[in-house]
Amino acid sequence: MPKSKTRTPVEIAVVGEVDDWEEDVIKGLLEVPARGECAFYIDSAGGSVYGALAVVTLLRYRRLDAAAVVLGECSSAALMLFAACRRRFVTPYSTLLFHRMKWESEKRIASTEALNWAKHFGDLEKDVDDLQVRLFGGAAEQVREWTLLGRYVTGREIVAAGLAEMFEI
């Protein structure tokens, strides 16, 4: 009988703003065999929802079995990656900020383009909120309430909601 190889999950640091880690995380995910395992170590205040969506899309497209460990903070757009993982770990000291999307632009644009963007932004915000709830796979009303309130949530609260496991330090 052939010996089975035990695969060690590829470990990926997710530290800083989304724009700081998006490229490295995507490259790291491409190193993981399709249907392989990876572990994310997260300390991120969030950032670009598009960058977070790119990472989550690749994670799901390649059907990776992912775990996430919140080392410190996991907020805003970084929550999308956390929610997309099959196993999630927090400490009692973990902080997670749920909030609605924020629009920020320094571009000079015509009023018609601004109106089109405003409609797109409203649709995207609802779709992203729905996706995040679906990715968490539980406590939908709690996640929606935290998001609406712009709430900082502790590791203990995430565990109590059934969305993660506690890792004591």
Residue ranges and their predicted role:
Residues 1-169:
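Terminal-region recognition feature
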